[in-house]
């Protein structure tokens, strides 16, 4: 996953070493949990995000991270989403949807662009409450994007956070 790896690194905000995975559930010390996607996805240890996943066939990567400080939570969703995708060149926003999910503000953005000269598609989801900003990113080559998009949507929908 040479081409999508740099984007994952470029979009990360924090690292936390005390997270754990039990019975297919990722538990963050920041108070949220996620169900890991199914077949073919592997956890990449030692990344800058709390959770990074990679799939080799078809190629793709996803991550989850949270930032829990007053400064970040005060920023608009659009700004937070742009920060997630700084490493994307020749960016084109395909779609942006803002709504509320589970008492949290949410923005989902679908983009296309390039990483290391390779065309990729990116889906970025930002959830925000009074305590934290939760970031989710899926990136894959354009021709492999749809193959993993359902896994990403299920991954994001499995989010369970701490009481707001």
What are these regions (language model features)?
Residues 38-41, 88-90, 134-164:
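Surface-exposed amphipathic alpha-helical segments
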Residues 17-19:
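Bacterial signal peptide processing site
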Residues 21-24, 32, 40-43, 88-91, ...:
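Short glycine-aromatic motifs
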Residues 24-48, 52, 56:
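Post-signal peptide N-terminal segment of mature Sec-exported envelope proteins
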Residues 43-135, 140-142:
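Conserved polar/disulfide-associated segments of primarily extracytoplasmic proteins
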Residues 2-9:
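Sec-dependent signal peptide recognition
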Residues 13-15:
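C-terminal motif of bacterial Sec signal peptides marking the signal peptidase cleavage site
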């Amino acid at each position: 996953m040479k081409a999508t790896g740099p984007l994952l690194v470029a979009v990360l905000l924090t690292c936390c070493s005390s997270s754990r995975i039990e019975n297919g559930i990722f538990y963050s010390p920041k108070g949220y949990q996620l169900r890991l996607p199914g077949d073919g996805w592997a956890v990449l240890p030692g990344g800058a995000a709390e959770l990074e996943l990679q799939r080799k066939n078809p190629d793709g990567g996803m991550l989850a991270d949270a930032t829990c400080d007053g400064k970040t939570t005060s920023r608009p969703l659009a700004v937070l989403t742009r920060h997630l995708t700084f490493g994307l060149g020749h960016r084109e926003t395909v779609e942006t949807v803002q709504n509320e999910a589970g008492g949290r503000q949410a923005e989902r953005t679908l983009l296309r662009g390039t990483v290391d000269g390779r065309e990729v598609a990116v889906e970025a989801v930002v959830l925000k409450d009074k305590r934290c900003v939760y970031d989710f990113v899926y990136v894959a080559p354009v021709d492999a994007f749809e193959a993993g998009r359902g896994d990403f949507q299920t991954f994001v929908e499995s989010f369970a956070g701490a009481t707001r």
